A protein has these predicted regions:
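Metal-dependent phosphodiesterase/phospholipase catalytic core, i.e.
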Residues: 85-89, 94-161
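Cleavable N-terminal signal peptides of Sec/SRP-targeted secreted and luminal proteins
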Residues: 2-15
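Loop/turn elements at helix/coil->beta-strand transitions in domains of secreted/extracellular proteins
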Residues: 75-80, 118-124, 150-153, 168-172, ...
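Short His-Asn-centered micro-motif
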Residues: 82, 126-129, 175-177, 201, ...
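Long, acidic (Asp/Glu-rich), low-complexity accessory segments flanking structured domains
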Residues: 15-79, 88-122, 180-189, 233-313
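Active-site-adjacent pocket scaffolds in enzyme catalytic domains
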Residues: 141-234
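Short, solvent-exposed polar/charged micro-motifs at secondary-structure junctions
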Residues: 54-56, 134-138, 164-165, 237-239
Length: 313
């Protein structure tokens, strides 16, 4: 049984806020309460935030979200991407070398507060090691276990690799993306994953889009256990990958590819043609969020998998 994808996207207000560089006040905090307890988590379509704590520290290159962690959950995000630097036997939250001004316990406390108010929801939490470890006397797994032990009422204890929603309501389900002796959640290696992309330039955007587009089709056919990152960094800012814009403001224009039609009409066929005059149109970039949403609606797909993206709200 698949949760209707179109309803999910509308419920998350993506139709109005495919890209939002401002904090949102559109909330959808209880959407899971409408779902049957018997739905397997792996068969649900779930929108999540990439580098969930990247709300501004480090500037444009590291800003990935316009909403606080609590607001992300309030607007309907149910998958969090938490990148942990192993430092002095604790987990500080990083995006590459940039410390994001919190630690894992701070993240867990915020999620606890949300789930105590909305116990019919569940939060998937992708935990992965980030940046260089330093000052530790134990393994990454041992440090994780210390957090798990002190939050045992909050973090789901795995009984299988295919839990249903009713088993995990009010809980955090860890997506375990780190080497370990034990199993502490859903193993990342049991999912088929479209990874985050390094961009050399903005012109890598179309390659990223074609990878996302192909993955969405395969995901719908597979029907379970798929994770995709609609994101990129490097020679492009995260806001550009999400929006295709020349600068991050909600009302700012799309960036031009510097190509025009009709001369380059076969190039970038899914990108918009804008500013047309006497038969000549500029080919503009488009954001992955917008391209994916429009494509999903056109295709009528029923399964999206778990998506991590930026600036939805």
């Amino acid at each position: 049984m698949f949760y209707p994808l179109f309803s999910l996207l509308i419920g998350l207000s993506l139709s109005q806020s495919l890209y939002n560089y401002q904090s949102s006040n559109v909330y959808n905090a209880t959407w899971m309460s409408n779902l049957d307890n018997g739905i397997p988590i792996r068969e649900m379509s779930i929108i999540g935030s990439h580098s969930s704590m990247g709300t501004g520290t480090g500037g444009w290159a590291f800003k990935t979200q316009s909403n606080s962690l609590m607001n992300q959950m309030m607007i309907g995000m149910r998958a969090l991407d938490i990148r942990c630097r192993h430092y002095r036997n604790g987990f500080s939250i990083h995006d590459r070398f940039v410390y994001l001004n919190t630690d894992l316990q701070g993240v867990l406390d915020t999620v606890r507060s949300f789930l105590s108010s909305y116990p019919m929801e569940t939060i998937l939490m992708h935990i992965v090691e980030e940046y260089d470890a330093s000052g530790n006397s134990q393994s990454f797994e041992d440090t994780y276990l210390s957090y798990q032990a002190s939050n045992s009422d909050l973090i789901w204890t795995p009984t299988s690799q295919n839990p249903v929603l009713g088993e995990v309501r009010g809980k955090i389900v860890i997506i375990q993306d780190f080497p370990a002796r034990g199993i502490h959640g859903l193993l990342y290696t049991t999912f088929t994953v479209l990874p985050h992309k390094y961009f050399n330039t903005n012109w890598d955007q179309y390659d990223k889009w074609t990878a996302v587009k192909s993955f969405l089709g395969a995901t719908n056919s597979a029907g379970k256990s798929r994770i995709s990152f609609w994101t990129g960094h490097g020679g492009s800012f995260p806001y550009f990958v999400a929006s295709g814009k020349s600068s991050p403001g909600n009302g700012d224009p799309r960036l031009s590819t510097a190509l025009t039609t009709p001369g380059f009409k076969k190039w970038y066929p899914d990108f918009p043609r804008v500013a047309c005059f006497i038969g000549i149109c500029t080919i503009a970039f488009e954001g992955i969020n917008i391209l994916a949403y429009n494509y999903l609606n056109d295709q009528g797909y029923t399964y999206l998998g778990i998506v991590f993206t930026n600036f939805v709200g």
